[in-house]
């Protein structure tokens, strides 16, 4: 059932939720101009461009956010957020405030999107800067012209965009904070739900249900091989039988058709030749870049965005300093600036020739939901061709940069021109068609490799010279069996495409959505494909039953539209939040009532008898999947692995260390493990993270257990590669040193992504312990190895 938010905007003068206060900061006429950005890499690039009159500092991201342990939203007071300063970045805040007091003026140069606008607004609050003053500068590429132009034209912070980001943050907090405890009661403690992530999980679960319900249907195709008088052979495919579409359902029908075709030669009844133009695709948006990076480079969306961030913020190039190589990477626009069009057209003509330059620039249509606030993703300077940067960029950086470079150049090149030949053959009652393609002019495809052309099936075989009325001899005919296929499982590329098509999320949210549903164990990857877990199905079923409106695809897309309207000043924060809350609060109240009534009724009772107390055991769910538990808990705490009796014993490739037999997979209450069917030996499963080893680029990082029982993550090619880290790695890289990032769990159970390189300036430093007892502790013998994203520094692990 589609839920609608009804919002009437009557007042044209809308007051922002950002609020106002009296600002007292006094500028220091003798100080420098202070510019604040998010990252040290970006700061370094901009400071090189502007020179010694400017000081550029990094905020290291958000310095204020909603509190971790409370809701942090005053629902009764117009949904006012209650922000707190980041305790872990207290030193950053202190330093920025100190430098602000010494500065002549302050320019906030955070990213040119809603998230960046919100960071600038939070900085204005911390630094006592009036957000309505000309303090905000924005640019879409980090190049000298763009930076200098931005500095000359500062503007007030766009409070509408701040409100739009604030609305997204508060919506997600309300859903997560209210839904998660409800899920704990229904399934198990520790589960969490998200507004957009739940919809993405739903799409994957519903696709899996379609696949499971699908029943394949057999069909056959028939192909004949013919020879001309000049003894040249070609293939033709059966299209019609007795003037009707050919439908062959089984082997017997296929054999009958094959025999019929072989009885006589065929006459060529028509030959048509058609010239076709194939135009290049538009330059990359965030979505299309992520899709191509998955399909062509085998990069995950998180890794793609991390690499793109590095290319945008700047790379040290000998003789040129720190250079931003691409435009801003979070965009839904395919637009190219007039200045870059003036540069790329002469470049194409000079490098590839006049024939490859179209008469006028190629212009691409806007997407229906495109905000068109930024340009497309493109190189910033055509001086830096990929082959010039091979010694400067890491392997993965270069691969992504080359992808962006080629896509941009191709988008402004002439189309490919080909000639398609279609010949129709008649053999008795059987009609066959032969097709061939000849490329007359390669156009933009001159940039594509042979491998890429094969991936896209661009080249079809040529046909020999064929003439109407001529007879050709049949040398062979054969049938081929096929079965209709179910819809494919989602990959990262296809899920991102679907989310974009359905209006769910925006360029900045695709990668976090995919990362979140995997971290929460709602879906897993088999190869490149997403497969929902038991817990993913369970949570999705519950949310669809009790929160049909909130996890509706249409409702989620509608909310995105309202967030856009807030950013454009066409709706207010308060009204959108109220419209959402009216829907959500009703569903939450109903869910609490109904779920309490039906919880016991919904319990799945098994046929397995508890050997300790004689009760029928019930099927329960944990983060590791289904298991059997005694209903008389806590008086009886018996649990067992869950088996339906329908599972086939899954044999692994792992040999038992004791007897050499092939081990089989078993499911325990704490997850899957290996068991020898002969001698009973148990063994833990080595878990592949799917993340490419950043040191050797050949193996994957896998989860292992050290001799002392501690888990760590090392290269699957060990001992050939000794890359290892203690904490769980993610497909994201440090913007300062390029090392892989890892998840660090703090004492308050909160996760934080940190650089794994202890020598990096962003790596959290341990406080010095002065106690005598601490100094006497034995030092670890764990070997430490180093490897960055391009074979640089990494912290070792594994003893």
Locate each region found by the language model.
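Basic, low-complexity terminal or inter-domain segments flanking catalytic cores
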Residues: 2-34, 44-47, 52-54, 126, ...
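Intrinsically disordered, low-complexity regulatory segments
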Residues: 2-169, 360, 460, 478
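Short acidic, hydrophobic short linear motifs in intrinsically disordered regions
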Residues: 268-271, 279-293, 320-329, 486-498
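Short, positively charged loop/turn segments that connect secondary-structure elements
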Residues: 294-304, 316-331, 486, 500-512
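Short, hydrophobic-biased segments on the C-terminal half of alpha helices
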Residues: 305-309, 514-515
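A short, conserved structural fragment
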Residues: 312-327, 520-529
